[in-house]
A protein has these predicted regions:
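Gly/Ala-rich beta-loop-alpha elbow adjacent to hydrolase catalytic centers
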Residues: 172-176, 180
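N-terminal cap/lid segment of alpha/beta-hydrolase-fold proteins
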Residues: 76-88
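Alpha/beta hydrolase fold serine-hydrolase catalytic domain that processes acyl esters and thioesters
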Residues: 2-45, 49-50, 54-62, 67-70, ...
């Protein structure tokens, strides 16, 4: 065994312990209570992890009894319905899982019938360059223009059209969370609200949440809200601005579950994004924030110059926000999917409904 949690086989290839369910999986979860939010979170995270390992199995040519991914879904009585393959590099970026129901495993009415899960960036193997390309598209608000997302949304639409939308889950981590969020938003615009489990979703903005001085942090947020709301109000007759506001309102009934670690700068801004709304309400400026939260300053400025701006992926009206307050060892620990199936976490959850 290698010193950094790697297992070396006889051929000399290495396997991370985190890929092996019997070492790193949620072994405490011997029976799933589908009404328990912690169980639902752990299963969703495990299925996302299985997508990571499906791709690693492909890269390492692990097949049959050598494959490490199946235990991650078999443990919870799922079967692999179909992997989702990127057309650019043939990597596995997602998967559709189907819950099996037997006499020994009667499916609860709260259990998902199908879970569509998406992995994040893998820094090993031949999928890295394509994953980084998709990460850049997130920053540029262009994920919806990629062929990978087109494959993803077609898979979601297929499952909903074929099996109905009841008890269909979306799940994803990091880049995969962005993919699941965008798919969920697209479906919500058509009136289909899917249960969504979004782990460490990227929030592309200045990392204000990392400012330690609370007065400075709140002051920056208030100033940003006033400027954004002012621009939106000044451009209220602009078609693009009005369409953005209407789209935001149409999403307000969708309540995705967001799982955030405050030590993860990629996603931690969601904490301030939602808390700031309540703070603005408390000081009597809720109307300003309700207008500001629908828009980004960059998008408004592009609209003012007569340029097309795409809807920022990270702007969502409502969410069930869960923050992991447990101490993270480092950034890798704070951003990792593995934290979300651990037992004994110090979690804070709050529902934010846009009104």
């Amino acid at each position: 065994m290698a010193s950094d949690g790697q297992i070396v086989d006889l051929s000399g290839s290495t396997t991370s312990e985190r890929e092996i369910f019997n070492i790193s999986g949620p072994l405490h979860l011997t029976k799933v209570d589908w009404s328990n939010p912690c169980h639902r979170r752990s299963v969703a995270a495990s299925l996302v992890q299985s997508v990571y390992i499906l791709e690693r199995d492909r890269q390492e040519k692990r097949e049959g009894s050598q494959a490490l991914a199946p235990p991650w879904w078999n443990a919870f009585h799922f079967q692999l319905y179909r992997p989702l393959i990127d057309d650019a590099d043939s990597c596995v970026f997602g998967a559709i899982y189907q819950l099996t129901s037997t006499q020994n495993n009667p499916a609860s009415h709260e259990a998902p019938r199908y879970v569509i899960a998406f992995r994040g960036t893998i820094t090993k193997g031949d999928s890295f360059s394509r994953d980084i390309e998709l990460d850049v598209h997130i920053i540029k608000n262009g994920l919806h223009l990629t062929s990978r997302f087109e494959i993803a949304i077609q898979a979601v639409r297929y499952v909903v059209a074929t099996f109905g939308s009841a008890n269909v889950w979306l799940a994803g981590h990091s880049l995969g969370a962005a993919m699941a969020m965008l798919a969920g938003k697209n479906m919500a615009k058509t009136g289909v609200f899917l249960d969504s489990f979004l782990f460490n979703p990227p929030f592309c903005s200045a990392p204000i949440e990392r400012i330690k001085d609370k007065k400075v942090k709140h002051g920056i947020r208030i100033a940003g809200s006033v400027i954004t709301a002012g621009l939106a109000f000044a451009m209220k007759n602009n078609h693009q601005t009005n369409r953005s506001g209407e789209t935001f309102l149409s999403l307000s009934s969708w309540l995705p579950c967001l799982y955030i670690n405050p030590s993860d700068y990629i996603c931690s801004e969601y904490i301030g994004y939602f808390e700031h709304r309540k703070r603005m309400d408390d000081i009597g400026a809720g109307g300003i924030e309700r207008l500001a939260t629908q828009h980004s300053i960059g998008g408004l400025m592009l609209n003012a110059m007569g340029m097309q701006s795409d809807e920022p992926l990270h702007l969502i009206p409502s969410a069930n926000l869960t923050v992991n307050r447990s101490q993270a060892r480092d950034f890798k620990d704070a951003h990792g999917i593995h934290q979300w199936w651990r037992s004994g976490l110090h979690l804070e959850s709050k529902i934010y409904n846009y009104r």
